UniProtKB/Swiss-Prot annotation:
It comes from Escherichia coli O78:H11 (strain H10407 / ETEC). Interacts with outer cell membrane protein GspD2 in the periplasm. NCBIfam families: PRK09681.1 (NF007242), typeII_sec_gspC (TIGR01713). Residues 1-42 are cytoplasmic. The keyword Transport applies. This is Type II secretion system protein C 2. Belongs to the GSP C family. Keywords: Cell inner membrane, Cell membrane, Membrane, Protein transport, Transmembrane, Transmembrane helix, Transport.
Length: 319
């Protein structure tokens, strides 16, 4: 009996010790896994810290060691040179890199306008450029439908949806339907007044009265006076001057404008040919340009016209 009890007790003890050992082994395995995981996390942390430190150190090194030499050469300098490209000496490049681009201001001369490229086509609009004047307010005398009008740069033509883009010495540039077109100064063939012989006009002028009777400035309608006071160049809205040509300008035919009140009030007649302006020869092509340039500062103008062989002076008050 005692042997049986002792045997059972020993078996029970062995089983109990086995369970304890198994439990201890499980705990030890768990602790080992946790230790491995802890080491892995610690290693990743130090690796990330090392990478971040390297990036920061590299950025600081680039910042403090940055030199102006890196900006002296354009990225395009590394490209292979073109066949038609000009070569530059290294000294020239170094000289350019040493310039103080934001230094003391130096006045820049107004660039001279270059001739328009040949690709700009002549306009097909039914308008004629009769004259051009330069000055503080460049203007162009343009004839539309038989009527002359003075336009400044940036203004729109009355009869067409075209804008005066530029005013040059012998032409103007128009912007029409999104395209740039050229309107050249009218040549002899564009004149609307026929002259059979320049000598005949000259002879007629010689046979005219030597000293025409000067007329006092006429009284013009109030509305016209107010318009001329604001802009004397609007006189061409009331009086049209069309060049009479025969191997050059021999005068200007005087015609009424859209509003003929000033034409009638001033005493002009159909067929009058203006040959002088303020006692200056009006047959010189530069006379019209001088007139348009001086108009803003004039208080009155005096036109000398030929009428049936006689000369008549007609004065017009602009203010």
């Amino acid at each position: 009996m005692a042997r049986v009890v002792f045997r059972d007790a020993r078996i029970y003890l062995i089983q109990w010790l086995t369970k304890i050992r198994h439990t201890l082994n499980q705990r030890q395995s768990l602790n080992t896994d946790k230790e491995h995981l802890r080491k892995i996390v610690r290693g990743m942390f130090w690796l990330m810290l090392l990478i971040i430190s390297a990036k920061v150190a590299h950025s600081l090194w680039r910042y403090f060691s940055f030199s102006a030499e890196y900006t002296a050469v354009s990225p395009s300098a590394n490209k292979p040179p073109r066949a038609d490209a000009k070569t530059f000496d290294k000294n020239d490049v170094q000289l350019i890199s040493q310039q103080n681009w934001f230094g003391k201001y130096q006045p820049v001369a107004t660039p001279v306008k270059q001739p328009e490229p040949a690709s700009v086509a002549e306009t097909r609009l039914n308008v004629v450029l009769r004259g051009i004047a330069f000055g503080a307010r460049p203007g162009a005398v343009i004839e539309e439908g038989g009527k002359q009008q003075v336009y400044l740069q940036g203004e729109r033509l009355d009869s067409h949806n075209a804008v005066i883009e530029e005013i040059n010495r012998d032409h103007v540039m128009l912007r029409y339907q999104g395209k740039i077109e050229r309107l050249s100064l009218a040549e002899e063939g564009h004149s609307t007044v026929a002259v059979t012989n320049k000598k005949a006009v000259s002879d007629e002028a010689k046979q005219a009265v030597a000293e025409p009777a000067a007329s006092a400035p006429v009284e013009i309608p109030t509305a016209v006076r107010q318009a001329l006071t604001k802009d004397p160049q609007k006189i061409f809205n009331y009086i049209q001057l069309t060049p009479v040509r025969k191997e050059g300008i021999v005068g200007y035919a005087v015609k009424p404008g859209a509003d003929r009140s000033l034409f009638d009030a001033s005493g002009f007649k159909e067929g009058d040919i203006a040959i002088a302006l303020n006692q200056q020869d009006f047959t010189d092509p530069r006379a019209m340009i001088a007139l348009m340039r001086q108009l803003p500062s004039m208080d009155s103008i005096q036109l000398t016209v030929l009428r049936k062989g006689a000369r008549h002076d007609i004065s017009i008050a602009l203010r």
